[in-house]
Amino acid sequence: MINWKLFLAAGLLLTITALSIVVRFQYVENSRLKLANQSLSAERDAARAQFTHYEQAVDIFNTIAGATQDAHQQAIQASQPQTIKIQEAITPERCAHLPVPTAAVNRLRAHADKISPRAASAHSSNVTR
């Protein structure tokens, strides 16, 4: 009878030891997973913040592009009456129907290439309308 009680006590001790080891491994694994989760959450939050900044930058660029396109369209519309007046004034002239010499075209293009866009935009307000 004593052997049976001793065997039962040893079995209980082994079971408790095994369960303690399993619980410890589970605790360590749980701690590791919590740290990994915190790290992934931080990465996710950083990625969201970065995406938000990119999204805001794209919105700003789209707004600027839209404003630039609107300004360009308004400039074209504002210059159309001038273009029509110039065409009406030039059309009766005999030379208006002659081709422009190639040398003159090349000189005008070379001169236009020398003018910087900044200088051209600075004088655009002086154009007679």
Swiss-Prot record:
Q: Which domain of life is it from?
A: Viruses
**The protein's name:** Putative protein p14
User: What organism is this sequence from?
Assistant: Acyrthosiphon pisum secondary endosymbiont phage 1 (Bacteriophage APSE-1)
